[in-house]
Design a protein with these regions (language model features):
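Ligand-binding face of N-terminal immunoglobulin V-set domains in extracellular IgSF glycoproteins
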Residues: 1-15, 56-61, 75
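Short, solvent-exposed secondary-structure capping/transition elements
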Residues: 2, 32-33, 80-84
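Solvent-exposed beta-hairpin/edge-strand motifs
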Residues: 7-39, 100-115
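Short solvent-exposed loop/turn micro-motifs enriched in small/polar/acidic residues
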Residues: 14-16, 53-55, 98-100, 135
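Short, acidic/charged, Gly/Pro-enriched secondary-structure junctions
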Residues: 22, 74-76
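Edge strands and adjacent loops of beta-rich recognition modules
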Residues: 41-55, 83-85
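Secretory-pathway-linked proteins and extracytosolic
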Residues: 62, 66, 78-89, 93-198
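Globin-like tetrapyrrole-binding proteins
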Residues: 71
Length: 198
């Protein structure tokens, strides 16, 4: 829906906070989103049924969305627990069905960690660290804007195949991703006394 924005995240691994959200009307009037219109909900799959997982959604319900209005939000996500210990990755894709303005990704990391960056369709790159960054940090800054939109299409490819994106990872190969996944997942496949048949 045009009057809603969803931010999906894993509640076990990260925190998401909406810092600011409003509708800007065609005449320049700003209408703030009320705090009770920013809701945390369980994620649902494509047919609307609940998903048994830690996936949550911050749902922002914008007021007075009408012809000529623009919706804006600013959020902060902080991942406090890695998906794979000893590794980092993040990815964000930009739908061709939405307009984007003023999107910025800043990434700062220790130089001892090798991070690969894929910023297809974005502007930016490596920049000088800020004085507030830890000494010796490596910093990247990328921006993205998209003024045009396209109607949705049935059976279109998934965004990962064509959309502009920002992705960063400490993994060097897909085989390394697979090994890390196996290390985390395999122990959970073992039969425990709690579920073993008598």
């Amino acid at each position: 829906m045009l009057g809603e924005q969803r931010i999906t995240y894993n509640s076990t691994l990260e925190n998401v906070e909406v810092l600011e959200a409003y509708t800007l009307l065609a005449d320049g009037t700003r209408v703030n989103v009320e705090p009770d219109k920013i809701r945390t909900q369980d994620d649902v799959d494509a047919d609307g049924s609940n998903i048994y997982s830690d996936s949550k959604v911050k749902l922002i319900i914008f007021p007075k969305v009408e012809v000529g209005a623009t919706v804006y939000f600013k959020s902060r996500a902080q991942q406090h627990t890695p998906d794979f210990p000893g590794h980092f990755y993040t990815e964000n894709y930009f739908s061709p069905h939405s307009k984007y303005k003023g999107v910025t990704f800043n990434l700062t990391h220790d130089p001892a960690i090798a991070i690969g960056i894929d910023a297809q369709g974005m502007k930016g790159g490596k920049v000088e660290p800020l004085p507030s960054d830890p000494k010796g940090s490596v910093r990247y800054s990328f921006s993205f804007e998209q003024d045009t939109t396209y109607p949705t299409e049935d059976w279109r490819l998934d965004l990962v195949h064509f959309a502009p994106r920002f992705a960063a990872s400490s993994f060097k190969t897909y085989a390394e991703v697979g090994r890390s996944y196996q290390e985390r997942a395999y122990p959970k496949t073992q039969i425990t006394p709690d579920i073993q048949a008598p």
